């Protein structure tokens, strides 16, 4: 039995790390992304019917919107994968400034939901600037680490500069308030600096300061303190501050091993708030059980592993910008998943973060799709670099992804 498990694990590992040689894009990454998107559409459709019926009278209102968002996301991936990495590096600073402007705008005219002003109405969907800020920060940080690589490794000044940028974004995010997005940005920034080779004592100072700051933010903000206390013992107040978590835990309890079956969730009947957004994982657990939960988590793990694997290949070949950015994306996907799943099962306080590529929400899907498109582009350019060398790969980059694939097929 153990040998069979090892053989199965080795087959999966080989599938993830050794795609067909003639291919100049990562097929496995495409299939993993499509699998997560389709899973998200199915679960969002099931989880959103009761609330959609009450709010709009159209049972599949949110499901149809989510399907539209998915189609747009696929178009975004197809477009982004054509953009050379040099363009993202070139425009990383303007993108960061645009994110700061959007974060200021949302404080002035943003739409408030549950006491947090996080969305800018744009007609067909509500833009969440925090999602744009995540992507912009990680692209900017990857470019900074390339430009100041030796300084980051040698001096505290090089280490502290990106934290100053993060501090500006943190201030604007906490004004909304959106502590969850800040925590994701902070952890991803720490991970990227670690990959770049910053000193250990610098991390200890930064993490200690961050923990102290987050603790003060929780203590001096009543609603955050209620979230933490309800997370520690939700059953103490199951109809008040602990209501959402207790309903989520009951959903997992009902799911057991095999689940209740698609469409058979009880908690989605408006017992569990935000069933199709922040707590879609609980509905998934109730309807598909432990087996379904495990499959979805393995898919997300495969996505994280792919990003990390692509980043490692780039760093080994000297393509630092793509390497740092791919590793940053892997930390982002992993930690945001950890927080979302942890909140649903009571391991961490509720943070209002979506489950990557699964939860309902246009902004989250579009930004995650952009990140996947950039990952595909990073992998594509790394393969060109490995196959043709630096000079020839740059010439092929200028002709676009499709031309490169056509040339490869002719060979």
Swiss-Prot record:
Highest rank taxon of the organism: Bacteria
EC numbers: 2.4.99.28
Biased composition (Acidic residues): 392-411
Keyword Transport: no
Chief localisation class: membrane
Membrane topology: Multi-pass membrane protein
UniProt GO BP: cell wall organization; FtsZ-dependent cytokinesis; peptidoglycan biosynthetic process; regulation of cell shape
Transmembrane residue ranges: 29-49, 66-86, 90-110, 122-142, 155-175, 178-198, 200-220, 290-310, 321-341, 355-375
Catalytic activity: [GlcNAc-(1->4)-Mur2Ac(oyl-L-Ala-gamma-D-Glu-L-Lys-D-Ala-D-Ala)](n)-di-trans,octa-cis-undecaprenyl diphosphate + beta-D-GlcNAc-(1->4)-Mur2Ac(oyl-L-Ala-gamma-D-Glu-L-Lys-D-Ala-D-Ala)-di-trans,octa-cis-undecaprenyl diphosphate = [GlcNAc-(1->4)-Mur2Ac(oyl-L-Ala-gamma-D-Glu-L-Lys-D-Ala-D-Ala)](n+1)-di-trans,octa-cis-undecaprenyl diphosphate + di-trans,octa-cis-undecaprenyl diphosphate + H(+)
Enzyme category, top tier: transferase
Record topological domains on the Cytoplasmic side: 1-28, 87-89, 143-154, 199, 311-320, 376-411
Protein's UniProt keywords contain ATP-binding: no
Protein's pathway: Cell wall biogenesis; peptidoglycan biosynthesis
Location in or out of the cell: Cell inner membrane
Annotated GO CC locations: cell division site; plasma membrane
Function noted in UniProt: Peptidoglycan polymerase that is essential for cell division.
Family (UniProt): Belongs to the SEDS family. FtsW subfamily.
Protein name (database record): Probable peptidoglycan glycosyltransferase FtsW
């Amino acid at each position: 039995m153990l040998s069979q498990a090892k053989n199965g694990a080795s087959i999966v590992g080989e599938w993830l790390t050794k795609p067909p040689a003639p291919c100049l894009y990562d097929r496995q990454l495409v299939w993993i992304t499509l699998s997560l998107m389709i899973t998200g559409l199915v679960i969002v459709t099931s989880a959103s019917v009761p609330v959609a019926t009450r709010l709009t009278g159209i049972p599949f209102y949110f499901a149809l919107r989510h399907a539209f968002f998915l189609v747009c996301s696929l178009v975004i991936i197809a477009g982004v994968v054509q953009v050379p990495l040099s363009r993202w590096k070139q425009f990383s600073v303007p993108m960061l400034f645009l994110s700061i402007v959007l974060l200021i705008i949302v404080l002035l005219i943003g739409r408030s939901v549950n006491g947090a002003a996080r969305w800018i109405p744009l007609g067909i969907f509500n833009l969440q600037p925090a999602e744009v800020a995540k992507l912009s920060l990680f692209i900017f940080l990857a470019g900074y680490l390339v430009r100041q690589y030796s300084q980051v490794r040698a001096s505290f000044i090089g280490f502290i500069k990106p934290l100053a940028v993060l501090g500006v974004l943190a201030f604007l995010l906490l004004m909304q308030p959106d502590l969850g997005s800040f925590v994701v940005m902070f952890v991803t920034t720490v991970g990227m600096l670690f990959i770049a080779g910053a000193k250990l004592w610098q991390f200890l100072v930064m993490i200690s300061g961050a923990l102290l700051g987050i603790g003060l933010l929780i203590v001096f903000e009543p609603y955050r303190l209620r979230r933490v206390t309800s997370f520690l013992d939700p059953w103490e107040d199951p109809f008040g501050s602990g209501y959402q978590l207790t309903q989520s835990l009951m959903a997992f309890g009902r799911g057991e091993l095999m689940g209740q079956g698609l469409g058979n969730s009880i908690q989605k009947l408006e017992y569990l708030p935000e069933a199709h957004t922040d707590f879609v994982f609980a509905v998934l657990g109730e309807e598909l059980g432990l087996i379904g939960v495990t499959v979805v988590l393995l898919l997300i793990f495969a996505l994280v592993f792919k990003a990390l694997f692509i980043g490692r290949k780039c760093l080994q070949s000297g393509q630092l910008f793509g390497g740092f950015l791919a590793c940053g994306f892997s930390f982002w996907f992993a930690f945001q998943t950890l927080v979302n799943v942890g909140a649903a099962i009571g391991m961490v306080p509720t943070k209002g973060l979506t489950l990557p590529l699964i939860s309902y929400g246009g902004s989250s899907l579009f930004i995650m799709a952009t990140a996947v498109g950039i990952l595909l582009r990073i992998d594509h350019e790394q393969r060109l670099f490995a196959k043709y060398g630096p000079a020839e790969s740059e010439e092929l980059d200028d002709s676009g992804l499709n031309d490169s694939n056509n040339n490869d097929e002719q060979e």
